[in-house]
C-alpha cells in the first residue's frame, strides 16, 4: 500500500488517493480539512527530497509560483514548510491532460487548436510578466477541463527540471518540445516557452510531432539543425495564416521568433477575428544560418 495514503500533512491535508506519477513527483488527491475542499498535492520524490540544495530551490520556486493567479494557470494554494517531505498543494482539476486529450482525439481541427493555444499563451503571458518562465511546456503539463478551458500546470516543478534531467530516454517526453537554446544548454527565457508552445500547436494541428528520433539526443539535435515539414503539407485544411503563426513561434533563431507571449496572442486574436487577415512572415526566416538548402517561402 502507498505509504502516504491516509496520512495527514501539517494537521491539515488528508491524503486520499494517488492520481498521477511523474519523473520528479507523485500527485495525490487530498482533502483540506481547514477549508473543507479537495485539492491535489504533488510530493517530491524521496531521492530528490534528500538533496538539500534541491529542496531549497524547490521551496523557493514553489513560493514564487504561488503568487501567480490566472484562469489559465493551475493555482498553487500552499507549499510545505520543512519536515521530512517537500510538497505543493494545488487546485484539483476536473479534466485530463492535453496529451491524453490528443491521444483520444488524434489530429485536432484548427478552430479547437486555436482555442487551446490562445489560452495557453494567456497563461504564459501572465507568468512571464511576473518573471516566471515555465521551461517545460508540453501537452503533459497542460490540463483540459470539461468546459473546454485549459490550464498550464507544473510551473514549480518545471523550473527545477534543468538540474535534475539530462537528455536521456527518460527525457524524451520533454525533448520533443524543447527549444533550440535549451538543447544547446543555454539559459532559457520567455521565448523558449513560446517555441515549445509552437510545437504544441504544431502537434495539435497535424497530429504529429515536428521531429522524431530513437533517442532524446537525436531529437534535440533536430531542433538545432532541422526545419520541420510545414503543417499544411500534412493537413491542407489548416489556414495558411495559422500555419505562419505556428512556424514563427517555432523559429530556431530567437530574433525571428515572437518576442513575447503578448505578441503571439495579438496575431492569434487577429486571425480569430478575421481568418483572412494577412500575417507577414517568411519561412526563410526559420532556416538556421548554417543550413544552405534552398529556401521555401510562403506568402499570404
Where are these predicted regions, by residue range?
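AlphaC helix of the eukaryotic protein kinase fold
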Residues: 43-67
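Protein kinase glycine-rich loop
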Residues: 16-22, 27
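Activation-segment/catalytic-loop signature of the eukaryotic protein kinase fold
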Residues: 79
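Conserved short submotifs of the Hanks-type protein kinase catalytic core
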Residues: 83-97, 101
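Protein kinase catalytic-loop region centered on the HRD/HxD motif
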Residues: 121-132
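Activation segment signature within eukaryotic-like protein kinase domains
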Residues: 116-117
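C-terminal lobe helix-coil module of Hanks-type protein kinase domains
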Residues: 143, 174-279
Amino acid at each position: 500500500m502507498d505509504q502516504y495514503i491516509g496520512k495527514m500533512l501539517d494537521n491539515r491535508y488528508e491524503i486520499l488517493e494517488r492520481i498521477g506519477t511523474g519523473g520528479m513527483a507523485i500527485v495525490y488527491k487530498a482533502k483540506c480539512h481547514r477549508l473543507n475542499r479537495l485539492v491535489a498535492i504533488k510530493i517530491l520524490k524521496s531521492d530528490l527530497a534528500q538533496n538539500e540544495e534541491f529542496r531549497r530551490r524547490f521551496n523557493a520556486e514553489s513560493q514564487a509560483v504561488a503568487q501567480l493567479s490566472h484562469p489559465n494557470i493551475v493555482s498553487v494554494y500552499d507549499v510545505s514548510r520543512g519536515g521530512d517531505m517537500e510538497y505543493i498543494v494545488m487546485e484539483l482539476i476536473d479534466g485530463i491532460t492535453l496529451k491524453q486529450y490528443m491521444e483520444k482525439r488524434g489530429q485536432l481541427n484548427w478552430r479547437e487548436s486555436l482555442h487551446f493555444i490562445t489560452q495557453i499563451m494567456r497563461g504564459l503571458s501572465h507568468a512571464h510578466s511576473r518573471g516566471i518562465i515555465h521551461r517545460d511546456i508540453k501537452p503533459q503539463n497542460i490540463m483540459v477541463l470539461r468546459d473546454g478551458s485549459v490550464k498550464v500546470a507544473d510551473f514549480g516543478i518545471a523550473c527545477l527540471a534543468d538540474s535534475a534531467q539530462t537528455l536521456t530516454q527518460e527525457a524524451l517526453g520533454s525533448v520533443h518540445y524543447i527549444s533550440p537554446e535549451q538543447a544547446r544548454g543555454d539559459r532559457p527565457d520567455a521565448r523558449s516557452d513560446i517555441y515549445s508552445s509552437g510545437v504544441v500547436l504544431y502537434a495539435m494541428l497535424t497530429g504529429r510531432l515536428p521531429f522524431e528520433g530513437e533517442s532524446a539526443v537525436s531529437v534535440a539535435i533536430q531542433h538545432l539543425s532541422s526545419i520541420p515539414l510545414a503543417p499544411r503539407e500534412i493537413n491542407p485544411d489548416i489556414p495558411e495564416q495559422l500555419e505562419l503563426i505556428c512556424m514563427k513561434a517555432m523559429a530556431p533563431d530567437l530574433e525571428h521568433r515572437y518576442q513575447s507571449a503578448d505578441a503571439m496572442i495579438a496575431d492569434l486574436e487577429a486571425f480569430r477575428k478575421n481568418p483572412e487577415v494577412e500575417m507577414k512572415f517568411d519561412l526563410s526566416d526559420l532556416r538556421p544560418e548554417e543550413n544552405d538548402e534552398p529556401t521555401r517561402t510562403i506568402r499570404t
